[in-house]
C-alpha cells in the first residue's frame, strides 16, 4: 500500500484558505473551547506583549486580547491569508484595538529576539514541516523568563475516538491519504521532552479529556472539510467522494446516541518558560 502524501506548506495554506469561512463554525466550535481553556492557564497580565502562532480565526487571539487589555498588544500570525481575514472580522466585531494580524511562517518569525512576554501556539505544532525550527523561533522571540503555551491532541484515546480512527482506516483502504507533516497526537511527556530540547524550562503539562458531541452526521462530516482531512477528501473525484462519505457515515450512524455522536478528545496543554 502506498505511503500517504505529506502536506507541504503550500498545501496547508490552501487547506485553510479553502476552509476559512467555515473554520470552527461547524458543530460545537471545539477550537474556541480549547483556545479559551489554554488562555485560562497562561499567566497573562495587563500590558503584556503576546504572540499567537497559527492564530486561525482567533480562538486564542480574542481571549488573550481581552486579558491583556488596551495597554497590552497581541500579534496573531498564520500562513493562510483567508483565515486571517476571518480573524480580522472577529477583531472588528469586538472593537479590539490592541491586535495586529500578519501573514507569516512560524519557522521564520519576522521579529527581533526577546520581543514577547508570552508566546502561544494552539494545535499548530503538527502543521510545521520543520517543527524544530518553529520551536527554536518561539524560544528566540520570547523574553528571558517569558512564558510559552502550547496545546495539542493527546494520544490516549486517539483523537476524536471513534470517529477519526474509523475515518483513517477507510482513507488507508482508499489509498488517498494526505498526512500532516508531524504526528497529530502526543503524550504529555513527549510534549515536555520537545520543549526541553529547545531551551524551555519549568515545563508543566496537563492532559484533559473532553466529550465532544456532534448533533448530526452532516455536522461531523462538515468538520472534516475544515481540517487537514480536507486535503484527503478533495483529492477524490466527486463520485468517489460521495461513495466514501456514504460508506463512512454508515459506519458511524449506529454509534449515535439521542443527542448525537459522542467523541473522546484528549488535549495536552503545556506551559514553559524561557
What do the PLM-derived regions correspond to, one by one?
Residues 68, 90-91, 171, 195, ...:
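Conserved hydrophobic residues forming the short capping helix/wall of the S-adenosyl-L-methionine
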Amino acid at each position: 500500500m502506498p505511503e500517504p502524501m505529506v502536506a507541504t506548506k503550500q498545501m496547508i495554506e490552501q487547506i485553510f484558505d479553502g476552509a476559512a469561512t467555515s473554520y470552527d463554525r461547524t458543530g460545537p466550535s471545539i477550537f474556541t473551547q480549547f483556545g479559551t481553556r489554554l488562555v485560562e492557564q497562561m499567566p497573562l497580565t495587563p500590558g503584556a506583549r503576546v504572540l499567537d502562532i497559527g492564530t486561525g480565526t482567533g480562538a486564542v487571539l480574542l481571549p488573550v486580547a481581552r486579558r491583556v487589555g488596551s495597554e497590552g498588544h497581541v500579534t496573531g500570525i498564520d500562513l493562510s491569508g483567508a483565515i486571517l481575514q476571518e480573524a480580522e472580522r472577529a477583531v472588528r466585531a469586538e472593537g479590539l484595538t490592541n491586535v495586529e494580524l500578519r501573514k507569516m511562517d512560524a519557522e521564520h518569525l519576522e521579529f527581533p529576539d526577546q520581543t514577547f512576554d508570552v508566546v502561544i501556539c494552539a494545535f499548530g505544532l503538527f502543521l510545521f514541516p520543520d517543527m524544530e525550527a518553529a520551536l527554536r523561533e518561539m524560544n528566540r522571540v520570547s523574553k528571558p523568563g517569558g512564558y510559552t503555551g502550547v496545546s495539542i491532541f493527546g494520544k490516549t484515546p486517539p483523537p476524536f475516538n471513534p470517529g477519526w480512527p474509523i475515518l483513517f482506516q477507510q482513507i488507508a483502504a482508499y489509498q488517498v491519504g494526505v498526512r500532516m507533516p508531524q504526528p497529530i497526537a502526543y503524550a504529555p511527556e513527549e510534549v515536555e521532552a520537545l520543549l526541553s530540547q529547545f531551551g524551555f524550562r519549568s515545563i508543566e503539562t496537563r492532559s484533559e479529556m473532553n466529550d465532544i458531541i456532534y448533533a448530526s452526521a452532516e455536522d461531523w462530516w462538515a468538520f472534516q472539510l475544515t481540517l487537514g482531512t480536507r486535503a484527503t477528501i478533495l483529492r477524490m473525484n466527486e463520485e468517489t467522494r460521495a461513495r466514501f462519505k456514504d460508506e463512512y457515515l454508515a459506519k458511524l450512524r449506529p454509534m449515535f446516541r439521542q443527542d448525537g455522536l459522542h467523541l473522546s478528545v484528549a488535549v495536552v496543554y503545556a506551559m514553559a518558560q524561557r
